[in-house]
Amino acid sequence: MIQSRQLEAFRAVMLTGGMTSAANLVRITQPAISRLIRDLEEEIGISLFERTGNRLRPTREAGILFKEVSRHFNGIQHIDKVAAELKKSHMGSLRVACYTAPALSFMSGVIQTFIADRPDVSVYLDTVPSQTVLELVSLQHYDLGISILAGDYPGLTTEPVPSFRAVCLLPPGHRLEDKETVHATDLEGESLICLSPVSLLRMQTDAALDSCGVHCNRRIESSLALNLCDLVSRGMGVGIVDPFTADYYSANPVIQRSFDPVVPYHFAIVLPTDSPPPRLVSEFRAALLDALKALPYETI
């Protein structure tokens, strides 16, 4: 079997044109370089050099072999470079799974900032339901995920992040638009556009209203918070949504107000548990946490 040391010696002779200079290049003795060339010729059964006195002349076969050997060494050099860049976290790829609300706009900003000084880093962002985030990350199809449903889940490490307050959305001209904070009791008898009954935020909203003895007209439900915002903007009612979606929709005709009592909006970062996250993933996680802490949303 051809040895890498033999190929290194052959390459050195081809580059320098002689045994002595090749020996100096690879820092071994001239007899050692001669032996490596001889062993290589015996291994492949081909004469690589014509010897005339102290001079060497590469054969045609040596020229062909040299092209392949050069590709081999160029590949190794490229791998060395890639490894060095990976160590510096300037190369690599990230696969991130995220549920809808943060993916609308917030995650785009995080990714934009993160790759600004990492030109060789690629990011794939997949927007899927929270339960799917947990499944995909636990199976290691993704490096990191953001999910609402982040309790004890097999194969996952869960890291809670700052909890925000849900907000109240009002249509333009609503009787409550002059209030800085809308209280649950203010919504007595109002048309309340609701999220799906299986939504955690819907359950928490219902609990807050029930605790205050408030009865609303729940004629319209939507499984998507963006649809809820659109319905509010059309004057169909008021709504309680997460701050990410409210912020994303803020350019449209809706009025955003604080809501009391507090309706908490919890979510978490999830990572596979099988092994420590690569450096690139750890740095993205840190950037994500910094961005969350910098948000102007009301925290709990």
UniProtKB/Swiss-Prot annotation:
Record-level Gene Ontology MF annotations: DNA-binding transcription factor activity; sequence-specific DNA binding
DNA bind region: 19-38
Entry-linked Gene3D superfamilies: Periplasmic binding protein-like II, Winged helix-like DNA-binding domain superfamily/Winged helix DNA-binding domain
Cystine pairs: none
Residues annotated as domain HTH lysR-type: 1-59
GO terms for biological process, alphabetical: positive regulation of gene expression
Family annotation (PROSITE patterns): HTH_LYSR
Keywords: Activator, DNA-binding, Plasmid, Transcription, Transcription regulation
Pfam family, one: HTH_1
UniProt cross-references to InterPro entries, sorted A to Z: LysR_subst-bd, NocR_PBP2, Tscrpt_reg_HTH_LysR, WH-like_DNA-bd_sf, WH_DNA-bd_sf
Described function: Positive regulatory protein for the noc operon involved in nopaline catabolism and uptake.
Family: Belongs to the LysR transcriptional regulatory family.
Name of the protein in its database record: Regulatory protein NocR
Organism: Agrobacterium fabrum (strain C58 / ATCC 33970)
UniProt lineage: Bacteria, Pseudomonadati, Pseudomonadota, Alphaproteobacteria, Hyphomicrobiales
